[in-house]
Amino acid sequence: MFLINGHKQESLAVSDRATQFGDGCFTTARVIDGKVSLLSAHIQRLQDACQRLMISCDFWPQLEQEMKTLAAEQQNGVLKVVISRGSGGRGYSTLNSGPATRILSVTAYPAHYDRLRNEGITLALSPVRLGRNPHLAGIKHLNRLEQVLIRSHLEQTNADEALVLDSEGWVTECCAANLFWRKGNVVYTPRLDQAGVNGIMRQFCIRLLAQSSYQLVEVQASLEESLQADEMVICNALMPVMPVCACGDVSFSSATLYEYLAPLCERPN
């Protein structure tokens, strides 16, 4: 089911800048028992992204209500919200563009997540590296060609997810998830000021770890440094947290961090 600017429809104007330039942002939320998990965080993410992309929006109360309505109809599943700058403007220029377009859709919850949660995730190093751009770093914008290529290469392997470096070789994230690793009592996660997506569940885990006995450090780390970990986990708003059992030839057997985070992230407030 799709809602475009509050109307049930599945067609979008070809002049919309989402199709012309990927000019917009999106978020993907989990629906549990008819409610959007971490609803306020998802709306805040969209607001922050629109501000950084200089997209003017005045429909936030309507959007929140539409998200709640679709979630109630789906009960359990996935809610995706896309915001584009709308139509207009000549070429790349944003002058005379808008109003912004909002697109909501609901789909079923990924059936394979339960199996992966039980068996653990295997990671493969991606040959595709992320470009560094502080103007876009952290935003879940509509330009996802890097992730499309990462996924295409991943599907030629037997791994479940990809470990992705940036163009300078620093560990950044996975194809569709953020990454944490633990060495002793210290938990590390990559800095995302140059590349990567600052995920909703990553933010939630950081808040949890700040209140825990673990020491959290946001780092610029090499692949070799990250693979010296005692344990790895990945997370996104849908998973929400999964243990990594192997990355390439390196195996992980500890699940201490996962066992701490998993129950707290399953139904986050």
Curated annotation (Swiss-Prot):
<dbReference type="InterPro" id="IPR036038">
    <property type="entry name" value="Aminotransferase-like"/>
</dbReference>
<dbReference type="GO" id="GO:0046656">
    <property type="term" value="P:folic acid biosynthetic process"/>
</dbReference>
<dbReference type="InterPro" id="IPR001544">
    <property type="entry name" value="Aminotrans_IV"/>
</dbReference>
<keyword id="KW-0663">Pyridoxal phosphate</keyword>
<dbReference type="InterPro" id="IPR043131">
    <property type="entry name" value="BCAT-like_N"/>
</dbReference>
<dbReference type="InterPro" id="IPR043132">
    <property type="entry name" value="BCAT-like_C"/>
</dbReference>
<comment type="function">
    <text>Involved in the biosynthesis of p-aminobenzoate (PABA), a precursor of tetrahydrofolate. Converts 4-amino-4-deoxychorismate into 4-aminobenzoate (PABA) and pyruvate.</text>
</comment>
<dbReference type="GO" id="GO:0046654">
    <property type="term" value="P:tetrahydrofolate biosynthetic process"/>
</dbReference>
<protein>
    <recommendedName>
        <fullName>Aminodeoxychorismate lyase</fullName>
        <ecNumber>4.1.3.38</ecNumber>
    </recommendedName>
</protein>
<dbReference type="InterPro" id="IPR018300">
    <property type="entry name" value="Aminotrans_IV_CS"/>
</dbReference>
<comment type="similarity">
    <text>Belongs to the class-IV pyridoxal-phosphate-dependent aminotransferase family.</text>
</comment>
<keyword id="KW-0289">Folate biosynthesis</keyword>
<keyword id="KW-0456">Lyase</keyword>
<dbReference type="GO" id="GO:0008696">
    <property type="term" value="F:4-amino-4-deoxychorismate lyase activity"/>
</dbReference>
<feature type="modified residue" description="N6-(pyridoxal phosphate)lysine">
    <location>
        <position position="140"/>
    </location>
</feature>
<comment type="pathway">
    <text>Cofactor biosynthesis; tetrahydrofolate biosynthesis; 4-aminobenzoate from chorismate: step 2/2.</text>
</comment>
<dbReference type="InterPro" id="IPR050571">
    <property type="entry name" value="Class-IV_PLP-Dep_Aminotrnsfr"/>
</dbReference>
<dbReference type="GO" id="GO:0005829">
    <property type="term" value="C:cytosol"/>
</dbReference>
<comment type="subunit">
    <text>Homodimer.</text>
</comment>
<dbReference type="Pfam" id="PF01063">
    <property type="entry name" value="Aminotran_4"/>
</dbReference>
<dbReference type="GO" id="GO:0030170">
    <property type="term" value="F:pyridoxal phosphate binding"/>
</dbReference>
<dbReference type="InterPro" id="IPR017824">
    <property type="entry name" value="Aminodeoxychorismate_lyase_IV"/>
</dbReference>
<dbReference type="GO" id="GO:0008153">
    <property type="term" value="P:4-aminobenzoate biosynthetic process"/>
</dbReference>
